[in-house]
């Protein structure tokens, strides 16, 4: 007879996806748990590489980083060996918040000499940085599309290959769609319904590009393209070309004179959020929940 162990989760608590500890069920915790699942299921980090609420030391301060990641071969989980730091906040905390925004993340990264990557998210906004040194010896934080996966392949961050597209898992597709929809609403000034329709156009382009076998994927935006207006316009031109094919195939949904109305900066951001996923192969129940 199989001995099945039953875990009873106390009311108001959740069981942490990585370390199994009970934590308070809060809006901030929901964001962290979603990110933890993505780290393991999509980025393929092992739970042994990840530490939750890791205490940092700089000066007299001892703040706790929400999530830190070490190399898979790291045997000493010390502050000097941290490679990635992730800060998760509830939706109401803005990235520009002086105490809990991206500046907090950058201060944590600065205190960890070998930490190259950092991510800040509140479930609606996401900011990713790679730490470096400029020609004057100053610490700089460069915007990136995403943190690297466990294999460390940076090329996949900028232009994923067809065979490397990832299936979305659990609430992550909903999480991504929500982030994109909010970005349109805030940055393009569109109300929820028009914002959804613009996002729908981009999703149709993503699926159309996935179907275009065996040609290389054209639905992508590199970190460099996202960072300047010329690159953003290049992305818009590339995606608009895909949308021309979408309109021909789905004439009952889109008019012949329809176009993607998003600001190039917003479009580049949304493309960079969606480009890593395989929407065609993602489980239908997950897609249904997200849509």
Model-derived regions: residue spans:
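Short, hydrophobic/amphipathic alpha-helical patches that form generic packing surfaces
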Residues: 36-37, 198-210
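A short, conserved, highly charged catalytic patch centered on acidic carboxylates
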Residues: 1-117, 125-162
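Long recognition/docking surfaces used for binding and targeting
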Residues: 204, 208-291
């Amino acid at each position: 007879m199989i001995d099945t162990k039953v875990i009873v989760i106390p009311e108001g608590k959740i069981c942490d996806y990585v370390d199994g500890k009970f934590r308070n069920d809060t809006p901030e915790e929901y964001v962290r748990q979603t990110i933890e699942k993505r780290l393991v299921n999509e980025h393929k980090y092992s739970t042994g590489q990840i530490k939750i609420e890791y205490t940092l030391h700089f000066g007299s301060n001892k703040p706790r980083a929400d999530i830190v990641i070490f190399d898979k071969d790291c045997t000493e989980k010390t502050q000097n060996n941290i490679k990635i730091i992730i800060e998760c906040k509830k939706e109401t905390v803005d990235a520009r918040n002086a105490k809990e925004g991206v500046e907090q993340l950058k201060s944590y990264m600065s205190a960890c000499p070998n930490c190259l990557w950092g991510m800040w998210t509140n479930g609606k906004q996401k900011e990713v940085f790679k730490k470096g040194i400029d020609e004057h010896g100053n610490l700089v934080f460069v915007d990136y599309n995403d943190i690297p996966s466990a294999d460390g392949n940076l090329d996949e961050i900028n232009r994923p290959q067809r065979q490397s597209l990832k299936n979305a898992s659990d609430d992550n597709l909903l999480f991504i769609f929500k982030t994109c929809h909010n970005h349109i609403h805030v940055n393009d000034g569109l109300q929820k319904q028009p914002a959804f329709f613009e996002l729908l156009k981009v999703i149709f382009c993503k699926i159309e590009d996935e179907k275009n076998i065996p040609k290389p994927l054209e639905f992508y935006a590199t970190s460099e393209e996202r960072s300047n207006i010329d690159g953003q316009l290049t992305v818009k031109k590339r995606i608009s070309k895909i949308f021309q094919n979408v309109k021909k195939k789905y004439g009952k949904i889109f008019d012949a004179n329809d176009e993607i109305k998003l600001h190039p900066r917003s479009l580049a951001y949304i493309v960079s959020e969606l480009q890593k996923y395989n929407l065609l192969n993602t489980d239908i129940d997950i897609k249904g929940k997200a849509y």
